[in-house]
């Protein structure tokens, strides 16, 4: 199959779920082109090994980024029009139609995003990662810039935070005209249905991990009594890391033998540094920054407990069953998450770990303390977590399932086309 992946920025180090799907499709012999509508990811020296192994940048087409300065934007837009208007005059006019597209046309954003597909391209599948990207994919298809079966995956912020900003009707046209939809958990599937998506047009396809890269190790109480607790995730509000830090500060009052390592980076780094200093836990709480997968595995391998205190952010942002939790569970770590978004679909409360209410540092501290005091639970919880991930989130199984979904949609469209042709022939006679 010939497949177009439409994404925002690319490659994003934290979006391994997208990289895994692209690599899986390539391994299965399919052609994948990647369209990064928001341009390259923010500069970082670290590049995910999958990007290099599969030479993904060679298959990536970037939309130019509009300058923030209005004058510079107008100058650059004039250059773009001079260079590209002849490729598709009709589409360029439509993309600049303020009466139809409002601010998106007036700001020239639609034109910028469409530059890589102006001449029109045909695919078997157009797979849009995130609902907001699905809106652009639908627009491109309606303008004749892309042809193919349109599939959109909802992953979290696009069906939580995005709704709060743009309203519950933002996906009405996409639900009506898109061919099929995927989501990574039942929590967000039900939300899509509540918003108007037909239940028969959407199914769950979890975000998978390569279990073979996360070796299972039974956890035992360390001989030196030093307990290492970890959290992995971006330093943003919805990851709830503030409550992890507060819980550890409470815990340190009764357990002097703990260490808390936070792996990740983000906009709240300075806030967390200040909180750590304010609570006086700088000697036991470490902000380690972003780590390559190999480095992450080394840290988790030496850890005993992982906490993921996700919360619903002020902007409405929510989490699905996050891959960082799956990776820790695959490695045998007992985990503590929250009753939040899709997390309860991953963690079996009391079996592979514990769930606590959002923003409840006291209960989080109690559960961590309970695990420290009951190390006999670690091994059984770790084994249950590994089984859960292997059964529901194995990347290779899910990539096979993705190919099956693509094929089902193509077959359905082919059957529908034949029925329409037969109906037309009968009417004519």
Task: For each feature predicted by the language model, list its residue ranges.
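Short hydrophobic beta-strand element within catalytic cores of glycosyltransferases
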Residues: 328-330, 334-337, 347
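A short, well-ordered alpha-helix in the C-terminal region of glycosyltransferases
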Residues: 281-284, 363, 370, 377-404, ...
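Nucleotide-activated donor-binding/catalytic signature segment of Leloir-type glycosyltransferases, i.e.
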Residues: 273-294
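Acidic anion/phosphate-binding donor-loop and adjacent secondary structure
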Residues: 46, 161-165, 193, 199, ...
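Acidic donor-binding loop of glycosyltransferase active sites
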Residues: 284, 301-316, 333
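Conserved donor-binding/catalytic core segment of Leloir-type glycosyltransferases
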Residues: 182, 218-239, 245-248, 261
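Carbohydrate-associated surface elements
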Residues: 187, 208
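Conserved acidic donor-binding segment of nucleotide-sugar-dependent glycosyltransferases
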Residues: 346-350, 354-361, 370-376
């Amino acid at each position: 199959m010939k497949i177009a992946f439409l994404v925002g920025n690319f490659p994003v180090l934290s979006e391994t779920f997208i990289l895994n799907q692209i690599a899986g499709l390539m391994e299965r012999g399919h052609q994948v082109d990647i369209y990064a509508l928001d341009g390259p990811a923010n500069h970082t020296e670290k590049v995910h090994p999958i990007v290099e192994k599969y030479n993904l940048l060679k298959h990536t087409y970037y939309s130019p980024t509009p300058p923030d300065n209005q004058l510079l934007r107008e100058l650059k837009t004039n250059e773009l029009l001079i260079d590209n208007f002849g490729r598709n005059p009709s589409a360029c006019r439509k993309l600049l139609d303020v009466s139809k597209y409002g601010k998106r046309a007036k700001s020239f954003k639609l034109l910028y995003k469409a530059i890589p597909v102006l001449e029109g391209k045909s695919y078997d599948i157009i797979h849009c990662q995130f609902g907001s990207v699905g809106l652009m994919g639908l627009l491109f298809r309606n303008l004749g810039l892309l042809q193919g079966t349109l599939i959109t995956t909802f992953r979290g912020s696009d069906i939580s935070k995005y709704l709060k900003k743009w309203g519950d009707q933002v996906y009405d046209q996409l639900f009506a005209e898109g061919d099929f939809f995927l989501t990574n958990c039942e929590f967000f599937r039900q939300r899509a249905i509540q918003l108007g998506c037909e239940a028969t047009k959407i199914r769950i396809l979890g975000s998978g991990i390569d279990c073979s890269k996360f070796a299972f190790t039974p956890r035992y109480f360390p001989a030196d009594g030093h307990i290492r607790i970890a959290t992995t995730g971006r330093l943003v509000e919805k990851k709830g890391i503030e409550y992890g830090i507060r819980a550890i500060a409470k815990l340190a009052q009764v357990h002097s033998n703990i260490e808390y390592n936070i792996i990740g980076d983000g906009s709240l780094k300075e806030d967390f540094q200040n909180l750590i200093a304010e609570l006086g836990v700088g000697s036991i709480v470490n902000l380690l920054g972003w780590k390559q997968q190999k480095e992450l595995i080394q840290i988790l391998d030496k850890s005993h407990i992982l906490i993921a205190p996700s919360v619903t952010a002020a902007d409405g942002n929510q989490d699905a069953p996050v891959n960082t939790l799956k990776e820790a569970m695959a490695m045998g770590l007992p985990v503590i998450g929250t009753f939040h978004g899709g997390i309860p679909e991953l963690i079996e409360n009391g079996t592979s770990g514990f769930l606590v209410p959002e923003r409840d540092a006291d209960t989080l501290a109690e559960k961590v303390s309970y695990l420290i005091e009951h190390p006999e639970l670690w091994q059984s919880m770790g084994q249950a977590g590994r089984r859960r991930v292997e059964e529901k989130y194995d990347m290779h199984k899910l990539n096979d399932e993705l190919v099956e979904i693509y094929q089902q949609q193509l077959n359905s469209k082919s059957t529908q086309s034949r029925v329409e042709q037969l109906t037309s022939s009968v009417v004519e006679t």
